């Protein structure tokens, strides 16, 4: 009976010692969190292994992540994976479609993103571009004559229109002279003419008798304007003036109209501020609807594919610039010892328990063997 009791005691003590030893060893990985001193003497094994080597652990974790986990090769394979690309394209299409079908106005979107100043900047930049283009256009065309500046088609249209213009002027002149207003104007012109000549009017009056001078002159003027020769004469005059104009410099226009007046007139006609305001008052959906299918169906897949291709080609430099090892090191260094302990235990809790149980099993086995040895030695 004593023999079996001795074996039970040695086995139990061995199991307790083995299990507790392993449990203590595991605890000493993390505890104590800080060094313990007796006077000036630091107690051995304080602090625990992980608190003591936390900085080195942070460095090694950073290297492990960069060298073995987030490697350029691994990320490159992921980026070139067809399933991943298809999934990313579909996700991007859904998200982009949500944005371009938004019922909010562009102005509301800009306010939401704190970009209210964009409207003012857009107006300023558009007006600046238009102004620069006008100045460049005028600077170039001011070096030309009208013949060089105007397109050949304009020359043809003007020259073909001259006879019609001459005919139009004469017809309008005849129509005006036949009216009462025209007759009154002609009469006044005749009176003014003879008033400056004194006795000449009396001499003409003797020849005409009681007939009004305007009644004699009006039909003759109308007859003159209606003759073919008059039309040819006016056509020739207009043609000569047109030829003179073609030889003159466009720059002469500046003496009549200043550049700034031209610029302001064009800007006023374009109404940049009103146009931009009207554009921003539209909803995102209204603006994007005409190109929605193109954006979602073509632009997004193409952009994602090109982006992934660029990312694959530059993944090494991207990871280098991100300095992942340093990021991991800094993050781990900021962990408190308690948090680091909880993190490790949450991952290895079951395994560490098994190590404790294994220590108890080995200790119990050794105690049992010791009991057998004592039995045989007796």
UniProtKB/Swiss-Prot annotation:
It holds the Pfam family DUF445. The keyword Membrane applies. GO terms for cellular component: plasma membrane. Signal peptide: none annotated. InterPro entries: DUF445, UCP032178. It is a multi-pass membrane protein. It is found in: Cell membrane. The chain crosses the membrane at residues 1-21, 357-377. It comes from the Bacteria. Keywords: Cell membrane, Membrane, Transmembrane, Transmembrane helix. Its main location: membrane. Belongs to the UPF0754 family. This is UPF0754 membrane protein BcerKBAB4_0766.
């Amino acid at each position: 009976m004593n023999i079996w009791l001795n074996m039970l005691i040695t086995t139990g003590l061995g199991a307790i010692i083995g299990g507790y030893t392993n449990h203590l060893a595991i605890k000493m990985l993390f505890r104590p969190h800080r060094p313990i001193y007796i006077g000036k003497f630091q107690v051995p094994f304080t602090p625990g292994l992980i608190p003591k080597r936390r900085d080195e652990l942070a460095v090694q974790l950073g290297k492990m992540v960069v060298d073995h986990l987030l490697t350029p090769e691994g990320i490159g394979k992921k980026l070139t994976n067809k399933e991943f690309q298809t999934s990313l394209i579909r996700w991007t299409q859904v998200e982009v479609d949500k944005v371009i079908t938004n019922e909010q106005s562009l102005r509301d979107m800009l306010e939401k993103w704190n970009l209210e100043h964009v409207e003012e900047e857009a107006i300023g930049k558009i007006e600046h571009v238009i102004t620069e283009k006008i100045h460049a256009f005028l600077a170039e065309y001011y070096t030309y004559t009208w013949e060089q500046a105007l397109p050949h088609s304009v020359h043809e249209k003007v020259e073909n229109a001259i006879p019609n213009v001459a005919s139009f002027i004469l017809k309008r002149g005849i129509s005006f002279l036949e009216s009462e207003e025209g007759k009154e104007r002609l009469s006044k012109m005749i009176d003014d003419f003879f008033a400056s000549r004194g006795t000449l009017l009396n001499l003409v009056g003797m020849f005409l008798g009681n007939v009004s001078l305007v009644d004699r002159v009006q039909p003759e003027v109308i007859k003159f304007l209606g003759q073919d020769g008059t039309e040819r004469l006016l056509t020739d005059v207009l043609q000569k003036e047109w030829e003179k104009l073609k030889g003159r410099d466009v720059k002469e226009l500046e003496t009549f109209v200043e550049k700034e007046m031209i610029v302001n007139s064009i800007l006023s006609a374009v109404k940049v501020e009103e146009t931009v305001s009207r554009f921003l008052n539209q909803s995102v959906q209204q603006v994007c609807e005409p190109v929605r299918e193109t954006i979602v169906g073509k632009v997004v897949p193409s952009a994602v594919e090109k982006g992934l291709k660029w990312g694959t080609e530059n993944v090494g430099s991207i990871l280098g610039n991100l300095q992942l090892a340093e990021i991991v090191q800094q993050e781990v260094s900021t962990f408190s010892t308690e948090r680091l302990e909880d993190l490790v235990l949450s991952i290895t809790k079951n395994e560490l328990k098994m190590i404790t149980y294994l220590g108890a099993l080995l200790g119990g086995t050794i105690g049992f063997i010791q009991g057998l040895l004592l039995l045989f030695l007796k």
